[in-house]
C-alpha cells in the first residue's frame, strides 16, 4: 500500500472547472456578477444579492462542533464534504467558509481549505493571498492608525487622550516580538512617542466589520463608528472624527465582494472574511450568505470553535444582521476529542497523540460525551435541530462510534458516521440524508404547531450585564459571573454612551466550555470571570474578556514555515 497523499498533492491532482462554469451552476451571470482572478477564482459583485432575490431560498445549515482539542475536529472538512455529499443524492449545495489567515498557515495550525478529498481548491491560492482581501484589511486598519498618530502630531485638535488609544496596528504574520512596542521614537518630527503594539489581521475590528457588513454603504457606516479612544473629557473618539473612515472604505471597496472557488468535486464555495473566533464572531461574511442562500437547495456555512463560541455568535450576532434563519445545525465530534473530554488524556498541538488515546475505550468516550450533549443543547436553545457528524478516523473503533450515537440519542439528535476526508462527498451521504430528514421532520412538526422555531437567546433591550450572565448560564453552564471593578466601570460607561443595545461576544478560551482551558467535559459549579470589557462599536458588539486572550500569535519551535518552499518547477511544497 502506497504512502497517503498530502492535502496539497490531492488538491494539485484535481481537475478544476472554469470558474465561470461554477458561477453558472449557481445562476450567476459571467458578464454581470463575476470578476475573474485567473481561471479558478472570481469575485462576486454584490449586485447579485438583489438580482437573485426572487429565487427560492436554500435550506440554511450551520456546521459547528463540540469543544475542540488544539488539533481541531474537522469543521471545514465536514462543511466541504457535506456540500459535496448533497450532489450524490441529487441536490445542489453551495458552501460558505472563512478566508484563511497566512499567519496560522505558516505556524502550527496549517491551512483552512479542508482536508483529504474534501477541500476547497486551488488550496494554495486560498491559504496564500487569494484575492488580497486580508492585505486590504491590513492596509485599511493601518491607514486609520496612521491617521490617529498624524492627528496627535499636528496639534491634537480633538483633544485625544494618548493613553486611551486602543487602535493598534496589524499584520498577517505570527510575530510575538511585536505584541508590545513603543512608537514615535527618534527626532521630534518622527511622531508622538507612546506605547502600542501589533495584532494579527484576523483580530482587527476591520475584519469583523467586513464579515458583518450587509452592503458597501453599511461597510462605510460601520467603519465610521469605530471607537479608537476617548478625549480628555472621556467622550468616545471615532474613525469618523479623525477623518479616516472614507479612505478605509475606498481601500476595502473590492474586498467586500465574496470570493468564488470550488471544492474537489465542483461544489461552489464562497470564501470570504476571516474574523478571529475568540474576540469576534468567527463566521464568514453576511454578504456571502445573502448571495449563497439563493443559489442552491442547501447553503452550508461553518462557525469557529465549538457551539458555545461560533454558533452562539452566529445565531445572536450574524443572523440578527443578515435576517436569515438556520434550518439545522451539524455538531462535529471526534472520538479522540471526546476521550480528551473525559479528563484522562492530554492533547497538545504539535505533539504526537498519547498511545493510550488510540486504544478501544467506549467508556471514556461516554464520559467525555457530556460535552457533546451540552453543545447539542446549545444549538437547541435557539430552536434549531441538531445532527451529530462523527468525523471518523482510521484509529476509531465501532464501539466508540456506538457510544457517541447513544449519547446523541439521549438528547434527541440524529447521528451520522462521516468519512469524507478519505471518500469525499460519498463519505458524507449519510450525514446529508440525516439533515434532509431532520429538516423535513422539523417543518412537519412546525406545521402541526410543534417543532422548533429559530429564536435569539436574548433581546437587544436587555442590559449588557444581563446579556453576559444569560450566555454564561445558559450556554457555558456557569453558576454565576464575577466582574473585576474595571469591567463593571466599562459596562456602566458603555450603557451611558448608548452602546447598551449591542449584542455581546464573550472572548474566552475555545478549549473549554468554561474560561479555564484545563476544565474539560461539561463542568459545573464554576463562575465566569470577566476581567475587562471592550467595545467593537463599528462591528456592532461588546466583547467582555474572560481570561488571557492573545491577539498576536507566536511561532512554535518548528513552525510550518520551515517546511514550506518552492520546488524546481515553481510549485509550492510543504503546505498542509
Swiss-Prot record:
Pathway: One-carbon metabolism; tetrahydrofolate interconversion. ATP binds at residues 69-76. GO terms for biological process: tetrahydrofolate interconversion. Its EC number is 6.3.4.3. GO terms for molecular function: ATP binding; formate-tetrahydrofolate ligase activity. Keywords: ATP-binding, Ligase, Nucleotide-binding, One-carbon metabolism. It comes from the Bacteria. It is an enzyme of class 6 (ligase). The keyword Nucleotide-binding applies. It catalyses: (6S)-5,6,7,8-tetrahydrofolate + formate + ATP = (6R)-10-formyltetrahydrofolate + ADP + phosphate. PROSITE patterns: FTHFS_1, FTHFS_2. Disulfide bonds: none annotated. NCBIfam families: PRK13505.1. Belongs to the formate--tetrahydrofolate ligase family. This is Formate--tetrahydrofolate ligase 2. It comes from Rubrobacter xylanophilus (strain DSM 9941 / JCM 11954 / NBRC 16129 / PRD-1). The lineage of its organism: Bacteria, Bacillati, Actinomycetota, Rubrobacteria, Rubrobacterales. The gene is fhs2.
